[in-house]
Amino acid sequence: RPAVAGDSVIIQPGETYETSFIAGQPGTYFYRATASTKIGFFGLPLPFTTDTQLFGAFIVDPAGKKPDPTERIMMISMWNNNIKFDSTTHEQNSINGLSWPFTERLTFKQGEEVNWKVINASNQQHPMHLHGFYYTVNSHGNIYKDSASGKESIHKAVTELLNPGETMSMSWVPEKPGNWLFHCHTMFHILPESFLRKVPKEDEMDPKDL
């Protein structure tokens, strides 16, 4: 990295393919696979329906950097399930393959720095918003390049827009205790219809659901 367009391989059914590359520019990257012929972000085939979860992250750290055991990676995806026998595409948003209320709850100590790598592997924009705190965007990149080496790109935010195929490295400090959310701020992405289970209406809720 940085890379050029079209650095992909085609794997036929039943084939295996082994590849290697030099870890170049430090940053947050991901790999993906699709059987689709639809064109999506950066002119690449668009993952759709059953292949929307075929991706993974890889992080290139600067030479000599010690591993950070507290660092977390979050991959945003959209599961387009049109396997049902109707003409509707059923879209569910997810982080690391899970949709609320099944997403992982993270617990941190007050005053300790938190470091996240966030990857938008979906085909839609996601303005990612953190409740209660500002966070520092240390880099903002895409599948070809990352701005991790440029200090001029570092800035504070409460919401950072990630276009399809974009990534960011962020850090923040939980200065006050509480239960805080990190979510996409696109309204219809946080509607109950986007979740993997039926969310009860307010008048149907039991106190233990809150």
Where are these regions (language model features)?
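Copper-binding active sites and cupredoxin-like electron-transfer domains
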Residues: 1-210
